[in-house]
Amino acid sequence: MSVTSDLMKDHLFVRRLGVVAQRCSDKLYANEDIPLEDIEVASVIMEEFVDVFHHGKEEKAYFPVTKDKNGFSEDIRKFLIEHELGRRIARMLRRELVLWRKSVREGSRYESKEPVARFLKSYAVFISDHTTKEDTFFNLIEDKKKLSVEEDKMIRKYYDVCKDHSGGGPRIEELLRLLEYLEHMPWMEDVA
């Protein structure tokens, strides 16, 4: 599998997380309960898999090699800006989850779940839009064979560094299992 195909494979996982985030948001807006712990798990996956691992591979390995090919630097600049948007949404979600958790510890009622619902929805929209644009870009790279075998091998080595930076293969596998756990929760059951 090429490094480009590897990134598109990650996008399949990331989109599944987007479905979970959207479902959580929809349920919260409908005043239905979603366990705080489940939303915290989704937040961890956003931070560790999407940001540290996947965006790390793109930002530290893939984009530096492809940015000077056929004027791709403007596309890559936009993707980097979008990555920062995703990070900001995830941080704002985390901030609201900390407040919610604090209210639980103190035995008080968390006043409004609307900010959590809003940031989950924003993240789901970000994921859908961003991965669609990146897949179009990656397909262009693949179709035009813009990466040499040597470049592919070099990027692959950096991918391994990104995997180690995010906790290694066992941690990535754990994050995959956590997403499967979320997908099988009762509040996800009526998702088509």
Where are these regions (language model features)?
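Small-residue-biased structural context
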Residues: M1-A192
